[in-house]
UniProtKB/Swiss-Prot annotation:
HAMAP family: Ribosomal_uL4_B. Belongs to the universal ribosomal protein uL4 family. Residues 60-71 have a biased composition (Basic residues). Keywords: Ribonucleoprotein, Ribosomal protein, RNA-binding, rRNA-binding. Gene3D superfamilies: 3.40.1370.10. PANTHER family: 50S RIBOSOMAL PROTEIN L4 (PTHR10746), LARGE RIBOSOMAL SUBUNIT PROTEIN UL4M (PTHR10746:SF6). One of its GO terms (biological process) is translation. This is Large ribosomal subunit protein uL4. The gene is rplD. GO terms for molecular function: rRNA binding; structural constituent of ribosome. It comes from Bacillus pumilus (strain SAFR-032).
Amino acid sequence: MPKVALFNQNGSTNGEIELNASVFGIEPNESVVFDAILMQRASLRQGTHKVKTRSEVRGGGRKPWRQKGTGRARQGSIRSPQWRGGGIVFGPTPRSYSYKLPKKVRRLAIKSVLSSKVIDNNIIVLEDLTLDAVKTKEFAGILKGLSVEKKALIVTADANETVALSARNIPGVTVVEANGINVLDVVNHEKLLITKAAVEKVEEGLA
């Protein structure tokens, strides 16, 4: 089982914690992680693109000139696709880009990125994370004490509004609950700060 240092929020170590090898100690599968990221990014797309077909653009109900005798090419409507202002053929329509990977694949992907954080020594396990009031300056001091200078994902066991509001204005810092941890968030942040209670919750859900 992988062991990592257990920190308190003042930045000092308080022993070690053993992580579940089936969640934090597997061989990362980059291909599965890539597929999971594509799935998440696809589901984030709005898909509200829309153009009008010849049946939707205004006008064009009357034949612009008679069929024969004018010397011009025959036309049936001024809203045919070849006309300026005409309808679009096979243009984009509103659609959902989201799709689902199999549950086992999604679980393998999140285990892979969590294991990568352990391998790269980019995981910090906190004994607890509590603030008496919403204080961005105080929270920034906690991060500094833990030597977190780049993008960080904070994972708490349950919803913690005080922590979430304190971290909201710090660039590159995101707070999520343990049951909302996902591949894209973990990959997009260099450091993973997770409380001991959140570790237990993640292990319970993935082991």
